[in-house]
């Protein structure tokens, strides 16, 4: 085919059935804009391809065929939106602008031209005349400047019902449109649309229902893509029982969890188990829906190594009858693919290494290309053998990917920017979890992520204790380093036992963070302020700060932060004895755990539910919660299981008065102080005061105070059930762990009862009585609700020694009942208040004594 030299003054006419497509002389257009376009020549020029559509009798047509013309205009708008074009509308004129930075802009313009051709053919009876002109303008040209450019055609006699293009547009479109020179008319005639490739037969043995394990992905990613490409219909779900359906959708949260953490180098076992359970159930339903379907083959790349082979073999766990095969070799001629189309193909190939199959349409929508554009692209990729499986971006052989990469090397920064910007959007939506692996992915794509993302990752990785000793030299001179330095200083001030100073520093730190809008660091600081106020028994203030932390977690859409904030709110309400609100937030926590699959919070959530039930005298319910927590911990968090067993045994002992738990308590009392506490308490409740040699261990207060910055972290081993609640407040205020304090009180009470009626032991009796009263007095002074129990035990001893009328006896009982009354102040429901005062074992004894002494 002979083409006239570039820059010649030429025009062309294309006869396509009833339409005409002409190439106009370059001289017809405004030289003002042309000068901008002429400054850059060849394939590297910055351009914007535009399509100008005019309906000469638009207003008359809107009166004669209002519905048809409105439908035609709506279609044009849809063409623009679906192909990533900016559409400018002015009376009878429509201008489609395909910006230079938009990937595949020429291919998108050709799709738009084809759609316009077919649509105007459909509306032939209504629209007799129209003019369509294609030209190239400067990429930064304004809509007014573009419209002025196209108005120049009015001085040229152009046939009605015509498609026209400038010489520059022809140079861009020549890979998609066939042009024949007409020397006599000094024009180009376009015969039609070029085919990119000859139709090739479907590769033998290849099926669309296949699992492709790429060299850069895991078997879990391959299974996710297969399930996304072949979703189960609603009809399949309708055959499930309500219980199975609920279980299936519960497990689906594991898939979402995996997708959020897709770049992590390792995954917890509970995720792997739930994921495989979900996939196993999926395949069961998949085969039930298509009983005669063959097991989907598992494909690996022709050049796949040993690791890819191992990943592919793991798929056999859920699909054991699937054959393991290699993808057929590709015969793709990458050089024959138009440059801009190759760029789009490579973009999809590279993006498929970072996103899943059900995110591809979303990705192209982010690039302003709709589903039909993606469908056409997949068709082109398959017919050119870029992909070996129809509509599957994961079946692109590695050598084809590498060839495409060499072809589009110049455009690589733009392509990386498109993918990383989409991933950044996913991160902001909460669909990607902040982690060092995510940061590494952004670095790989050369994306400049924000400082808040780095902080978000650090606060995910490290607890406050770890951050206090974190080496931050690598962040020196950055916003991250400045924030970490301020936050570290706050923590270190707190560790020097100056609570007020730590609070002031935290408030100053918060002001700095809010000014810079570092939401993740703001979340952590609000949590720190909440713990500082909890440590001072300011529960109302703590609820405010934890509430702000919850708002930040919701803004970040971070499941782990959300669960943490909900748990902190629940334990604050628990410490306040507002059990209704505590249960409400534990219920919200349970929902968040299910939604985000943050299973590491499940054990402590169940444990605190058990503690609330225990406080209200619901011993059977408490036992069920502790047993469920222990069973789950045994599977995935073995270090948490013994403590749950200890508390379950305690609840069982309270519920059925069984003493079978004694052996468990004795085995574990050396490692778990709660076991020793419950062992002593069980003897006291059973009135077994016959062995003075028992319980000679009296844990005293620690010699050095704990740091005044209280905190709770799942990363720290938990040896006491009080450490996530009471120890944060009263255990720190008196430097006496709550479990040790309780066991000491019960041990002193036990020995008071043992030596009470032994004249030779009265000195020992008074020693234990004084110790018991000293601990009770201090608990009363600091507002510890346990003072009600301690003072009741003091009352019981005084009653047995001095009688009910003695002043000391009455004083102990009065103070004990006053503490209990103060404890029910936040219980708004009468039933809850009654449960707490009359169903709880020790509270019921105190309540009965108060009634007997006319205090109620």
From Swiss-Prot:
Transmembrane segments: none annotated. The keyword Mitochondrion does not apply. Keywords: Repeat, TPR repeat. InterPro entries: TPR-like_helical_dom_sf. TPR repeats lie at residues 107-140, 523-556, 603-636. This is TPR repeat-containing protein TP_0123.
């Amino acid at each position: 085919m002979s083409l006239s030299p570039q820059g010649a003054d030429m025009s062309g006419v294309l006869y396509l059935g009833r339409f005409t497509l002409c190439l106009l002389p370059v001289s017809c257009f405004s030289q003002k804009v042309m000068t901008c376009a002429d400054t850059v020549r060849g394939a590297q020029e910055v351009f914007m391809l535009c399509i100008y559509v005019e309906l000469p009798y638009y207003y008359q047509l809107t009166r004669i065929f209002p519905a048809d013309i409105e439908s035609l205009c709506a279609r044009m708008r849809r063409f623009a939106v679906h192909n990533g074009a900016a559409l400018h509308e002015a009376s009878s004129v429509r201008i489609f602008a395909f910006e230079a930075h938009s990937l595949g802009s020429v291919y998108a313009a050709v799709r738009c031209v084809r759609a316009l051709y077919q649509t105007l053919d459909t509306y032939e009876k209504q629209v007799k005349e129209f003019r369509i002109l294609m030209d190239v303008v400067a990429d930064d040209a304004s809509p007014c400047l573009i419209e002025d450019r196209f108005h120049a055609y009015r001085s040229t006699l152009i046939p009605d019902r015509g498609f026209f293009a400038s010489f520059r547009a022809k140079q861009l479109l020549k890979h998609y449109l066939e042009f024949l020179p007409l020397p006599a008319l000094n024009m180009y005639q376009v015969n039609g649309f070029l085919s990119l490739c000859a139709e090739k037969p479907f590769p033998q043995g290849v099926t669309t229902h296949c699992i492709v394990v790429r060299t850069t992905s895991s078997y879990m990613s391959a299974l996710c893509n297969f399930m996304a490409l072949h979703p189960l219909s609603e009809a399949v779900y309708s055959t499930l029982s309500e219980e199975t359906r609920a279980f299936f959708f519960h497990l689906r949260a594991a898939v979402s969890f995996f997708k959020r953490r897709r770049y992590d180098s390792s995954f917890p076992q509970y995720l792997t188990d739930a994921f495989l359970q979900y996939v196993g159930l999926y395949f069961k339903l998949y085969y039930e829906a298509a009983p005669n379907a063959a097991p989907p083959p598992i494909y690996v790349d022709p050049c796949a190594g040993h690791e890819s082979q191992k990943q592919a073999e793991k798929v056999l766990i859920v699909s054991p009858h699937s054959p393991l095969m290699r993808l057929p070799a590709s015969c793709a001629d990458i050089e024959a693919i138009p440059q801009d189309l190759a760029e789009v193909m490579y973009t999809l190939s590279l993006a498929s290494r970072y996103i899943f199959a059900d995110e591809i349409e979303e990705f192209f929508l982010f690039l302003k290309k709709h589903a039909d554009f993606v469908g056409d692209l997949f068709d082109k990729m398959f017919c050119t053998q870029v992909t070996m499986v129809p509509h599957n971006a994961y079946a692109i052989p590695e050598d084809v990917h590498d060839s495409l990469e060499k072809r589009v090397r110049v455009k690589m920064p733009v392509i990386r920017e498109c993918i990383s910007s989409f991933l950044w959007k996913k991160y902001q939506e909460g669909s990607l979890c902040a982690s060092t692996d995510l940061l590494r992915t952004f670095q790989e794509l050369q994306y400049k992520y924000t400082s808040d993302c780095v902080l978000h990752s650090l606060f995910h990785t490290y607890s406050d204790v770890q951050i206090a000793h974190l080496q931050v030299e690598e962040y020196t001179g950055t916003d991250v380093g400045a924030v970490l330095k301020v936050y570290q200083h706050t923590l270190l001030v707190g560790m020097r036992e100056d609570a007020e100073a730590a609070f002031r520093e935290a408030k100053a730190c918060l002001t700095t963070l809010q000014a810079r809008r570092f939401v993740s660091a703001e979340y952590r600081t609000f949590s720190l302020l909440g713990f500082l106020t909890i440590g001072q028994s300011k529960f109302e203030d703590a609820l405010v700060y934890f509430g702000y932390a919850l708002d930040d977690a919701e803004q970040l859409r971070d499941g782990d932060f959300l669960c943490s904030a909900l748990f902190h709110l629940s334990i604050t309400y628990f410490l306040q004895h507002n059990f209704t609100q505590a249960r409400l937030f534990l219920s919200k926590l349970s929902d968040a755990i299910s939604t985000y699959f943050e299973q590491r919070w499940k054990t402590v959530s169940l444990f605190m539910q058990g503690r609330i039930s225990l406080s209200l005298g619901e011993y059977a319910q408490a036992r069920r919660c502790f047993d469920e927590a222990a069973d789950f911990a045994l599977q995935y968090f073995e270090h948490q299981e013994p403590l749950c067993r200890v508390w379950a045994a305690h609840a069982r002992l309270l519920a059925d008065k069984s003493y079978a738990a004694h052996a468990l308590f004795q085995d574990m009392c050396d490692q778990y102080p709660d076991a020793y506490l419950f062992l002593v308490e069980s003897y006291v409740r059973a009135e077994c005061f016959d062995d003075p040699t028992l319980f000679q261990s009296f844990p005293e207060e620690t010699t050095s105070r704990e740091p005044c910055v209280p905190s709770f972290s799942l990363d720290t081993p938990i040896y006491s059930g009080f450490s996530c609640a009471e120890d944060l407040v009263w255990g720190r205020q008196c430097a006496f762990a709550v479990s040790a304090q309780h066991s000491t009180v019960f041990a002193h009470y036990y020995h008071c009862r043992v030596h009470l009626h032994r004249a030779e032991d009265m000195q020992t009796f008074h020693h234990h009585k004084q110790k018991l009263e000293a601990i009770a007095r201090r608990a009363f002074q600091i507002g510890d609700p346990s003072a009600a129990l301690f003072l009741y035990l003091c009352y019981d001893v005084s009653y047995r020694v001095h009688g009910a009328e003695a002043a000391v006896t009455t004083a102990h009982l009065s103070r004990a009942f006053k503490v209990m009354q103060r404890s029910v102040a936040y219980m708004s429901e009468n039933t809850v208040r009654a449960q707490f005062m009359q169903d709880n074992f020790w509270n019921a004894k105190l309540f009965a004594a108060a009634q007997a002494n006319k205090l109620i």
